[in-house]
Amino acid sequence: MKKLDRIIVALDQMSLDEIDQFLKLKDNNLPFVKIGLELFVKYGPDLVHKIHREYQKKIFLDLKLHDIPITVERSIASLKNLPIDFLTVHLGGGVPMLKAAVDEARISIPDCKILGVSFLTSLEASDLESLYGITNTDEAFLRLFKAASLSGVDGIVSSPHEVALLKKHFPKLLSVTPGIRFQDEIDSTKVQDQKRVMDPAEALKSGSDFLVMGRSLTKTSRFSERMKSLQE
């Protein structure tokens, strides 16, 4: 797989016009985009169909479903025949919920992979301890990864710092990693919304299968330069 094929660009905090302008950029040959909760609530399935039809992009629908099993099952059923490649659910929903998600996805969106979200990249170790009493983060992540494996989930969404742990114990699970920023952004302390971050080259070396990048690509005035660096 080419390096650019492993980059998923998050279309977060963008208007329809901004999305169109970005996807029409001359050097934008990124094949995969992410539509998050905000955009999906605002524009619904029409946005998914539009991007798939007009730009032939693969689509990661990042809804992070987390509810009782029947509600998650019916929510996925409502996505029937939507042209999506990835869909997220929260691993914290437990094995019954995860199995319900996987089973319904095989029926309603059979070409879509179900990804389990571990802990949000906006949380760091101190947050996990204060919220959940977690003092051993590796053990906490492994419990979630095990639930994913038992449930038939296709992959894991986690920060790049957990990828080595995932691949060591569950190598067959895909690793999709947000929290990816260019090194100069990390060095300049411009990263505020995510705490467990890494640059693209390092994340790929750690074993990530797909990298999720947002404003580093969508809000930059150096897009062509950034694209070249991703291909090096």
Which residues does each predicted region cover?
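Short, acidic/polar
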Residues: Q13-L25, I70-S78, T137-A147, Q194-E202
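Glycine-rich phosphate-binding active-site loops on the catalytic face of alpha/beta enzymes
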Residues: L82-G94, D193-R226
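Structural motif
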Residues: N28, E54, L82, S151, ...
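Generic structural signal for well-ordered alpha-helices
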Residues: I19-L23, V48-H49, I76, V95-V102, ...
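Conserved, mostly hydrophobic/aromatic
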Residues: V9, V33, K64, L87, ...
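Glycine- and other small-residue-rich loops at beta-strand/loop junctions that grip anionic moieties
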Residues: L11-D12, G36-F40, I68, V89-H90, ...
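Conserved alpha/beta-domain cores
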Residues: L11-Y55, P69-V72, L165-K167
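Conserved anion-binding
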Residues: K3-I7, D67, T71-S75, K80-G155, ...
